[in-house]
């Protein structure tokens, strides 16, 4: 029995860069369930890499900072995939550089570029692709488990993700005027990905977060992917304009007794 009911359906995924990408794990779960996956990557170099790990796949190139490229992308995809049953937006970027800076020293250009790529791109993508979306399609983006925890290494990306969380609600309301397309986010806690490796000091925070999980085992990318695919399926038809937190219980365990005991003994 196909519980998810996504076999034979077509999904567009933005953001695969390598095998450690969240988007890659999502594509694997979709493919295992019998879905058709179409990929969008940022550059020819990334396309070459993704072609090696996903041979024979439909892979398109689009730099989402340029709206004309998104428009052309939709035109190109429509020729071979005129109906999409879902879109995965797994795109984020922050120009952290090599030195961790205090939040108040955030440069305007860096902040606005992050908003453009990590948040506004979703608005632009769904607007351009709206005529290709099935009336019951699902759009899922990747956010973070909390934007209220001021973790220094993540810097201005937390406010950017907060904007993304709000954007989900407004897109859901806006699209409801002419369709039943749903918009949700999967709000994941710390993951071991290539992108996160570029965040200054990330590893220490990742290992600490692992100790805060109720199971004392870090969140796996595959677990995030499973949640995304559920939201893409009709089995989640009653969920719209929501952020589903996937953090292995970390958010209720900031006062973990073992960690407190170790800290107080120092």
What are the functions of these language-model segments?
Residues 180-182, 239-241:
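Short, small/polar-rich loop/turn modules that mediate ligand/substrate recognition or access, typified
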Residues 62-71, 75-79, 89-112, 131, ...:
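Conserved mid-core segment of classical short-chain dehydrogenase/reductases
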Residues 213-224, 235:
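A conserved structural motif in NAD(P)-dependent oxidoreductases
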Residues 199-213, 262-265:
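A short C-terminal helix-loop "cap" of Rossmann-like NAD(P)-dependent dehydrogenase/epimerase domains
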Residues 182-192, 232, 245-247:
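Conserved SDR Rossmann-fold cofactor-binding beta-strand/turn motif
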Residues 3-40:
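Canonical Rossmann dinucleotide-binding motif of NAD(H)/NADP(H)-dependent dehydrogenases/reductases
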Residues 229, 240-266:
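Short C-terminal tail/terminal secondary-structure segment
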Residues 15-24, 92-131, 135-178, 187-192, ...:
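Catalytic loop of short-chain dehydrogenase/reductase
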């Amino acid at each position: 029995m196909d519980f998810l009911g996504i076999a034979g359906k077509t999904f567009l995924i933005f953001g695969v860069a390598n095998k450690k990408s969240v988007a890659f794990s999502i594509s694997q779960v979709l493919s295992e369930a019998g879905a058709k996956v179409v990929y969008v990557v940022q550059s020819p170099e990334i396309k070459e890499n993704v072609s090696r790990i996903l041979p024979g796949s439909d892979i398109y190139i689009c730099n989402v900072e340029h709206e004309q490229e998104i428009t052309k992308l939709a035109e190109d995809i429509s020729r071979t995939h005129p109906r999409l049953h879902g879109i995965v937006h797994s795109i984020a970027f922050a120009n952290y550089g090599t030195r961790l800076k205090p939040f108040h020293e955030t440069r305007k250009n860096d902040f606005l570029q992050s908003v453009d790529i990590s948040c506004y791109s979703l608005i632009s993508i769904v607007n351009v692709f709206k005529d290709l979306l099935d009336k019951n399609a699902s759009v899922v983006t990747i956010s973070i488990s909390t934007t209220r925890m001021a973790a220094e290494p993540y810097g201005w990306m937390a406010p950017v993700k907060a904007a993304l969380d709000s954007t989900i609600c407004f897109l859901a309301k806006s699209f409801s005027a002419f369709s039943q397309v749903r918009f949700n986010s999967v709000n994941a806690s710390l993951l071991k990905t290539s992108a996160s490796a570029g965040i200054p000091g990330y590893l220490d925070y990742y290992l600490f977060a692992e100790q805060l999980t109720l199971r004392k085992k870090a969140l796996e990318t595959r677990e995030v992917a499973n949640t995304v695919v559920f939201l893409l399926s009709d089995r989640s038809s009653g969920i719209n304009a929501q952020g589903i937190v996937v953090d292995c219980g970390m958010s209720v365990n900031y006062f973990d007794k073992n960690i407190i005991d170790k800290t107080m003994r120092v």
